[in-house]
Amino acid sequence: MSFISEFKEFAMRGNVIDMAVGVVIGGAFGKIVSSLVGDIIMPVVGVVTGGVNFTDLKLTLKEAAEGAPAVTINYGSFIQTMVDFLIIAFCIFCVIKALNTLKNKLPKEEEAAPAEPEIPADIALLTEIRDLLKK
């Protein structure tokens, strides 16, 4: 089997395609949440906290010099990213909780009792002989 045909077989499996769709949708969802946080939630939080723009919050370690930018720790961007993460984690939690609730409400299939294995002929014959000797 050639390398190309093996790759084609691998890529066309259902699980790989499902995973690819999930990654694309997850990326789009992440962009939506980032926009929600950056454009809607954080400005409101900034107004509530006295007009603070979180993306401008930073700690300057070294001032800018000729030809070199300032060295800063941008903790405001980190706060915004943490809010993104919390919203995404909460949404995923809600989806999983809803799926588990639906899964628990569906009637469970009763497991069939395992069939007794067929007794080999020699064992059946020995059992018969034992029973006859007991009489």
Swiss-Prot record:
The keyword Transmembrane applies. One of its GO terms (cellular component) is plasma membrane. InterPro entries: Mechanosensitive_channel_CS, MS_channel, MSC/AndL, MscL_channel. The chain crosses the membrane at residues 10-30, 76-96. It comes from the Bacteria. Keywords: Cell inner membrane, Cell membrane, Ion channel, Ion transport, Membrane, Transmembrane, Transmembrane helix, Transport. One of its GO terms (molecular function) is mechanosensitive monoatomic ion channel activity. It is a multi-pass membrane protein. Homopentamer. Channel that opens in response to stretch forces in the membrane lipid bilayer. May participate in the regulation of osmotic pressure changes within the cell. This is Large-conductance mechanosensitive channel. It comes from Campylobacter concisus (strain 13826). The gene is mscL.
